[in-house]
């Protein structure tokens, strides 16, 4: 039990006392202009990377039993060019250096669950990539949740927001 508690304390210490190594400042496509957010990446030593996501303006349905869940992935290219028909296709596919089937891509992350007001916040620990590996890649938010089965990308739907992952000022 002590080890588990100690690791959690270490993660809280990292988030409260360290600066992120990398960041992505997501912006919505022309069809989702209200979506803005910040995804921060903190090295967590031998445990991997802590990913902190804080996103606002997500499109929510307002229904009682809503499913306002949005897939989030690291994509292979850092380009976030958008056109009216296919937003952010320039970002390429999911980061997948080992050529694994979905959902075992390095870039597969848990989804964001939006609140009634369109805001979402999450903290995730992953060992699928290192912070240095994702510099110059992109973060994509999708309109639907990932089903974690459909190949090649989980049937997550339209790409609604994107950002290139950059090294933070502190680490340049």
Descriptions of predicted regions:
Residues 1-172:
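N-terminal leader/targeting pre-sequences
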């Amino acid at each position: 039990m002590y080890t588990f508690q100690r690791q959690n304390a270490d993660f809280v210490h990292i988030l409260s006392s360290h600066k992120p190594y990398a960041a992505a400042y997501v912006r919505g496509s022309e069809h989702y202009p209200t979506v803005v957010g910040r995804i921060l990446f903190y090295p967590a030593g031998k445990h991997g990377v802590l990913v902190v996501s804080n996103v606002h303006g997500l499109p929510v349905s307002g229904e009682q039993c809503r499913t306002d869940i949005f897939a989030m992935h690291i994509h292979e290219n850092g380009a976030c060019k958008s056109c009216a028909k296919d937003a952010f296709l320039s970002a390429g596919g999911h980061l997948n250096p080992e050529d694994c089937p979905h959902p075992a891509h390095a870039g597969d992350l848990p989804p964001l669950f939006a609140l009634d007001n369109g805001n979402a916040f999450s903290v995730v620990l992953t060992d699928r990539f290192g912070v240095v590996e994702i510099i110059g890649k992109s973060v994509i938010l999708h309109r639907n949740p990932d089903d974690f089965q459909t190949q090649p990308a989980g049937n997550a739907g339209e790409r609604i927001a994107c950002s290139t992952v950059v090294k933070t000022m502190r680490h340049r």
